[in-house]
Amino acid sequence: MSQHTQDNQINNNETIEIQETDTVPVETNSLQSGLTSLIPMILIFAVFYFLLLRPQEKRRKEREKLVSGVKKGEEVLINSGIYGIVTKVSENDNNIEIEIAKDVRIKAIKSAIVDITSRKREVAATQENNKKNKKVSCAKSS
């Protein structure tokens, strides 16, 4: 019996007290971790959109406006590096005719137009006139 009492004493000395604590459900943690791993992906997509896609869309719209507004008599540059004057614009089949030298005409599609150089010259001339007018008005007021 002495051995039995020694075992009881050992068991009494080795008892562990467990205290109850408030626990957070596991489902909430997994939902939060899922959302936090999704946030970087959303940020990457937003950066991609604003740095690449949006500017490209703007350029495409500007180009469409440029190409659709080409008129007879304008000087253009096409993507093959040829300058010429538009002699004919076909609205239905999207073609233009360009005179590159006297009595030398070629056909091209409108999307081949890289730039309308006559418009740039007009803008540059207008800006030059504005600068001259400002200088003259400043000189008169002095």
Curated annotation (Swiss-Prot):
<keyword id="KW-0813">Transport</keyword>
<dbReference type="GO" id="GO:0005886">
    <property type="term" value="C:plasma membrane"/>
</dbReference>
<keyword id="KW-0653">Protein transport</keyword>
<comment type="similarity">
    <text>Belongs to the YajC family.</text>
</comment>
<keyword id="KW-0997">Cell inner membrane</keyword>
<comment type="subunit">
    <text>Part of the SecDF-YidC-YajC translocase complex. The SecDF-YidC-YajC translocase forms a supercomplex with SecYEG, called the holo-translocon (HTL).</text>
</comment>
<keyword id="KW-0472">Membrane</keyword>
<comment type="function">
    <text>The SecYEG-SecDF-YajC-YidC holo-translocon (HTL) protein secretase/insertase is a supercomplex required for protein secretion, insertion of proteins into membranes, and assembly of membrane protein complexes. While the SecYEG complex is essential for assembly of a number of proteins and complexes, the SecDF-YajC-YidC subcomplex facilitates these functions.</text>
</comment>
<feature type="region of interest" description="Disordered">
    <location>
        <begin position="1"/>
        <end position="21"/>
    </location>
</feature>
<feature type="transmembrane region" description="Helical">
    <location>
        <begin position="33"/>
        <end position="53"/>
    </location>
</feature>
<dbReference type="Pfam" id="PF02699">
    <property type="entry name" value="YajC"/>
</dbReference>
<keyword id="KW-1133">Transmembrane helix</keyword>
<keyword id="KW-0811">Translocation</keyword>
<keyword id="KW-1003">Cell membrane</keyword>
<dbReference type="GO" id="GO:0015031">
    <property type="term" value="P:protein transport"/>
</dbReference>
<dbReference type="InterPro" id="IPR003849">
    <property type="entry name" value="Preprotein_translocase_YajC"/>
</dbReference>
<keyword id="KW-0812">Transmembrane</keyword>
<protein>
    <recommendedName>
        <fullName>Sec translocon accessory complex subunit YajC</fullName>
    </recommendedName>
</protein>
